Structure formats: C-alpha cells, structure tokens
C-alpha cells in the first residue's frame, strides 16, 4: 500500500526526491530460544531495511522461515529469526539490505543496560562486556558489509536511553561504525500520544507505557535537536541525522507488483471430456472431488 500511495503521488509538487524504503523489525535470537525454554530467553529487536527488490525478497524469505519457528510467549506470538538464518540470507544479499541495532529492546542496547553498574563497580569485568559489544558490532559489519550496518540512537529524556546513546556514540568511534538517529515511531503525531496510550493499556492494563513511548512519534529535525542537543551537542545530533542520508543514497526505487503470468498448459483437444475425466479422476484429491460434486 505504501508503494501504491507513493506511485500515485510521486509526480506531484513537494514529492521530489522522496523515496519509500520497506523493511522489517525482527526478533534476532540465539538458537536456544524454543517453545520449551521461551520464558528464560529474550527476543531482541533488530531492524532490516530493503534497499531494492532483491533485498525485499531476502527479507520476505527470512520472515517466512521465522514464522515456521514461531511459538506463543505469554499472550504474544513470537517469531524468532536465528543468527544463523540471518547469516545465510545475507550471504546472498550484501548490498541489498541495511541493518540497524534498533531500540532499547535490541540485543546491543539491552546488554549495555544490563551491565551498566559494572562500569563503576567492577571495571575489569566491564571491560570484557565492552569488548563483547565491540565484537558484536564487528560481527554485524562483517555480515552486512562495510557501511551497511548502523548504530541507532533515539531521542528521549529517559536515563536509560541517554546512557545507551552515549555508549553507542563511543562504540561508533571505537569500531568506525556510523550511527543514525530515529524516533522508533509507534504513532504519527505528538497529539496521538494519548490515543496510543489507551490502545496499549487496553491490551495490558498494568503496563506503564506513557513515559516509555512519549517520544516514539515522527519528529521534525528541530524537535529531535530540542530533545537531544543538551545531552550530546548540536554537531553530534546533526551528524546522526545526516547519516540517515547514507541509507537514502543507497536505496533504489522498486515495485513489488508483477505482470500477470498465466502458465501454458498443453491440452490434447482430440480427447473428449469423458475420456480425460476417466484418465485423471484418481488423481483428484477426495476432498476436492467431494466439493466438486456435492451438488
């Protein structure tokens, strides 16, 4: 639908240079995540963005495989994508897909928060954790290719997000990996915050949602600067916004629609229908046969 809408508007004034990119937010999991031990494992978020039709095909295939591996966790359907599946898919799609570390629900931000206290209390152990984070980033750069994996910062006044943003900036410098700024948009406009809150509470009434999702809407550059400049400085924030253009420049215009391709089925027109029926009736599944002749 997004591509159809774009196709109908792309020639209008104000749409010059606009691009639509499609992707998927997946659960990127280790292979010990199963229905049996699902309560002892997390389902970390990860972002995939298709830069062209071939990349979109790869993401679709990966999503199909994840659904085959699905299971219920609490009241939610979980569809894990294993690291090995991502590796296998990306082996054929380098340059077609961009990856991003995602929100606080991602594997890297979660690990940074999980061991935050060690930074002050046990520097030696924290150094090992920090190295594992650098290794994870290097692993992603290897899978996606140089310049196709990004660290994702997000605007927020929450202490957890501010801490993670600072650490991602440090990782960016130490691993030579570009960072971007996104808003993890769950709703369109700031005025929609209350509606979004009511929607979430209708599903999980005891869940605190207001503060966590207060900044997860589509912001202007000015709004992002208002949220982030005091913590990181104008130039750092502007660089994160400018880096999103690295993805824009890689993205191609593509369509998902195809021309109707009716297969050619050769028929022996010399054989009457009755002869054909007797010849093939045993190959018709009983369920189909019953449906055909129930009247």
Locate each region found by the language model.
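Phosphodiester-processing cores and adjacent nucleic acid-binding clamps
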Residues: 1-295
């Amino acid at each position: 639908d997004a591509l159809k809408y774009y196709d109908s508007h792309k020639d209008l004034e104000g749409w010059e240079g606009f691009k639509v990119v499609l992707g998927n937010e997946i659960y990127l999991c280790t292979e010990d995540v199963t229905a049996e031990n699902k309560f002892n494992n997390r389902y970390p978020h990860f972002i995939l963005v298709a830069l062209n039709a071939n990349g979109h095909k790869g993401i679709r295939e990966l999503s199909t495989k994840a659904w085959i591996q699905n299971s219920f966790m609490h009241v939610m359907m979980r569809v894990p994508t294993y690291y090995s599946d991502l590796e296998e898919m990306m082996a054929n799609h380098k340059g077609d897909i961009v990856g991003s570390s995602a929100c606080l629900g991602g594997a890297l931000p979660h690990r940074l928060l999980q061991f935050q206290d060690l930074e002050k209390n046990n520097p030696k152990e924290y150094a090992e954790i920090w190295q594992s984070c650098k290794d994870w980033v290097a692993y992603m750069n290897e899978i996606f290719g140089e310049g196709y994996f990004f660290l994702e910062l997000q605007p927020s006044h929450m202490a957890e997000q501010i801490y993670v943003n600072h650490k991602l900036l440090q990782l960016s410098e130490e691993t030579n990996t570009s960072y971007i700024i996104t808003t993890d948009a769950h709703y369109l406009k700031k005025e929609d915050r209350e509606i979004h809150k009511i929607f979430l509470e209708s599903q999980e009434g005891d869940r605190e949602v207001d503060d966590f999702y207060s900044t997860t809407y589509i912001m202007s550059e000015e709004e992002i600067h208002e949220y982030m400049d005091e913590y990181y400085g104008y130039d750092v924030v502007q660089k994160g916004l400018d880096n999103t253009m690295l993805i824009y420049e890689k993205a191609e215009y593509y369509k998902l629609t195809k021309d109707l391709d009716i297969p050619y089925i050769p028929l022996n027109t010399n054989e009457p229908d009755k002869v054909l029926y007797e010849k093939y009736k045993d190959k018709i599944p009983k369920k189909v046969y019953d449906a055909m002749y129930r009247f």
